[in-house]
Amino acid sequence: MAIVINKRNVRVLVITNLLLIVVFFVLRNSNASVNESITTHHPDSLVTFDNSGNAPGTHQSVHDTVNTQDKEAEEVDKNSGDAEFDAAAEYNKIMEQSPMIVFSKTGCPYSKKLKALLTNSYTFSPSYYVVELDRHEHTKELQDQIEKVTGRRTVPNVIIGGTSRGGYTEIAELHKNDELLDSFKKWSDGAFTVKANSQSESA
């Protein structure tokens, strides 16, 4: 059977070829788009990311997610830092060590004189408790709390019954006038006993 080629057949063939060409380009562009959206594997990572930087199952950029997590971590660290040292709790804990507390500093000459006076001239039961503020990890915060509670920031600071009884000058003056022993007994309110040593020396 002979195929008759006429203008109509030619037109049909041309249109068919054009349609095939259009379909070819459409499919080609579609494949290119699919390839662009293929997820990318980042070395040293267990998560794959697409070209927008999104991880599967997430709606925001991984970089944004990391930044958010970093900010949250900083907030946690900040809050943890604020809660690391509670000066009030530390002060109360120190007060539980003995009915008589002496806040001191190792390099302070007046602190040294006071400790020598107490050691050489009196015997306490239970013994008083000495806190060397310059050896404390949070010197400033604790000293601020001491001032807040007792009204006295300087050292030495003798605390009996939760009240500051003075520093070296006040204690030495009472000792010099033979009034310190009676003062200790009054301040103790029975919480501790104290007696003067036989070889008592005035400062």
Swiss-Prot record:
Residues 1-32 form the signal peptide. [2Fe-2S] cluster binds at C108. One of its GO terms (biological process) is iron-sulfur cluster assembly. GO terms for molecular function: 2 iron, 2 sulfur cluster binding; glutathione disulfide oxidoreductase activity; glutathione-disulfide reductase (NADPH) activity; metal ion binding. The keyword Iron-sulfur applies. Pfam families: Glutaredoxin. InterPro entries: Glutaredoxin, Glutaredoxin_euk/vir, Glutaredoxin_subgr, Thioredoxin-like_sf. Keywords: 2Fe-2S, Iron, Iron-sulfur, Metal-binding, Signal. The gene is GRX7. The lineage of its organism: Eukaryota, Fungi, Dikarya, Ascomycota, Saccharomycotina. Residues 88-191 form the Glutaredoxin domain. GO terms for cellular component: cis-Golgi network; cytoplasm; fungal-type vacuole; Golgi apparatus; Golgi lumen; iron-sulfur cluster assembly complex; membrane; nucleus. This is Monothiol glutaredoxin-7. PANTHER family: GLUTAREDOXIN 2. It comes from the Eukaryota. Transmembrane segments: none annotated. Belongs to the glutaredoxin family. Monothiol subfamily.
